[in-house]
Curated annotation (Swiss-Prot):
Protein name per its UniProtKB record: N6-Methyl-AMP deaminase-L
Species name: Xenopus laevis (African clawed frog)
Pfam families: A_deaminase
Matching SUPFAM superfamilies: Metallo-dependent hydrolases (SSF51556)
Entry binding sites for N(6)-methyl-AMP: H21, N23, H69, S101, T102, P103, R104, D142, G175, E205, D283, D284
Length: 347
């Protein structure tokens, strides 16, 4: 495949997105809307960086996160962000999305509970508006908050798990991997598992985390985020293989975050050759200026995947969602209905 027809194939391909941080997924267009609401904030200097898109340096990407926190401090902001992000994923052909975000209190008076309620309201409004995407939510534990904040997040997740009509499905463990240790979070994560919540844990994002990774694999998690350096330990690889734990792989994020030096060296190839379950994801589509169609295209070009290989990756990803068996069956039916039209652009 080449040219516009190829790009159209990846756009038309129905896709599953399972590793998308809400704040990191905010697009340039949405950031400009938010900044226009807050003229009192001295962040106009950030406009140049925001407009750079794919040319942003890693440091500028980190600066973007700081600006995002400044301009998303009210319920109105969170509602706008949630709806815009969902609609952008839908426009890119994503049919099932698990968003994740850390509930936070803001100086503007937003509580953690209200934060989650607002995200769920955004999901509901998109559904009412007929946006063609099924969206669920994972509450994220930020490592920087330590075990106390983690316990609060688990309690919130348990409450919403019971009351949200299957919108809240689980928890994410993320944040700066150099802060704290996995053992700090074993108790709240175990409690979450016992409550029926699913666990998606960022593991082995940096080298020399073998001990922590092995500890957290003992839970075990239902999915692994990134897992960039899992392959440095044959013992860890065997544990992951034996338990068939799906990985969430984010190619552009790893390249821009400089944890992987080139597309060819990305661990996609390692796990693909093992026929191990994984799903392609964006991580932070706004900050890293990508989308899921682009991630599939990069993987296909780098690892010589045919359109049928690409289709299989997308279809198999349905099994790695945290959705119910009924939802998975409905998604598979939807994929098969769409398949003939999708492959018209693959020829």
């Amino acid at each position: 495949m080449a040219g516009e027809g190829a790009l159209q194939f990846y756009r038309d391909l129905p896709k599953v997105e399972l590793h998308a941080h809400l704040n990191g997924s905010i697009s340039t267009a949405t950031m400009k809307k938010l900044m226009a609401r807050k003229p009192h904030l001295d962040i106009q200097h950030g406009m140049t960086m925001i407009d750079k898109g794919q040319k942003r340096t890693l440091e500028e990407c980190f600066q973007m996160f700081k600006i995002i926190h400044q301009i998303t401090d009210t319920a109105e902001d969170i509602l706008l962000v949630t709806k815009d992000v969902i609609k952008e994923f839908a426009a890119d052909g994503v049919k099932y999305l698990e968003l994740r975000s850390t509930p936070r209190d803001t100086p503007a008076g937003l509580t953690k509970q209200a934060y989650v309620e607002t995200v769920l309201e955004g999901i509901k409004q998109c559904k009412e508006e007929g946006v063609d995407i099924d969206v669920r939510f994972l509450l994220a534990i930020d490592r920087r908050g330590g075990p106390t904040a983690a316990k609060e997040t688990v309690k919130l997740a348990e409450d919403f798990f019971c009351s949200s009509n299957e919108l809240v499905l689980g928890l994410d463990l993320s944040g700066d991997p150099t802060v704290g240790h996995g053992r700090d979070f074993m108790e709240p994560l175990n409690k979450a598992r016992q409550s029926g919540l699913k666990l998606a844990l960022h593991l082995s994002e940096i080298p020399s985390q073998t001990e922590e990774t092995e500890l957290l694999l003992g839970l075990p998690p239902d999915r692994i985020g990134h897992g960039t350096f899992l392959t440095t330990s044959a013992h860890i690889v065997e544990i992951v293989k034996k338990q068939h734990i799906p990985l969430e792989l984010c190619i552009t994020s790893n390249i821009k975050g400089q944890t992987v030096s080139s597309y060819n060296e990305h661990h996609f190839g390692f796990w693909y050759n093992l026929h191990h379950p994984f799903v392609l994801c964006t991580d932070d589509k706004g900050v890293f200026a990508t989308d899921l169609s682009v991630e599939y295209e990069i993987a296909a070009k780098t690892f010589n995947l045919t359109p049928h290989h690409v289709w299989d990756l997308s279809y198999q990803a349905i099994d790695y969602t945290f959705a119910s068996a009924d939802v998975k069956a409905n998604l598979k039916e939807k994929w098969l209905l769409l398949k003939p039209d999708v492959f018209r652009h693959a020829l």
